[in-house]
Amino acid sequence: TVMVDNRVDRLPFTPNVHQFNSDNTQVNWNGLLGRLELIARPALWLDDVRIFPDVAHRSFRVEITPGRLTGDRSKGMVTVLATSFNHGGKPHRPPPVSAPVLAHDKSSVITLVLPLGDEAKLWDEFSPALYRIAVTLESPAGRDDREIEAGLREFKPHGTQFTINGRTTFLRGKHEAGVFPLTGHPPMDVNGW
């Protein structure tokens, strides 16, 4: 059973910060949309994986939070491997990095630095080279895998403008508040998005 409870007194936000409770764009977006699935995981699994690009050092910092069900210390080995793709050249595969995992409390975080070397492919809108970063956690309880796509880029302000990897860029977008689809829910297919 799944219960969706959108009562305002149960949501942690200030008044009128979203269309959910704005007089101008209030809608009833209750329910669950999109793909729902239940996945079996080992007793020690990859609860969260976060990727942080570091252009200056040509590397990714990978923060891994293991999840566990038991109260005892859980042991395993985590491995991170990156492979570039979508850039038209030979895939770049730097050597993988590994570290032991000893999950002893809910705040255990393993931080690994994955050096990419001088052949690292940078990402920007004109050269959108990406890496598939495969994270594997192996333990006596089983194996859990996660794959994340990430680009090696540095986004920062420069005077009154922004740069990506030192190149001036312009951010484009649009605001679509108060848009009500005829179906009563957002599109659920690729073409609609």
Annotate each predicted stretch with a short phrase:
Residues 1-193:
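Secreted/periplasmic carbohydrate-active enzymes, especially glycoside hydrolases
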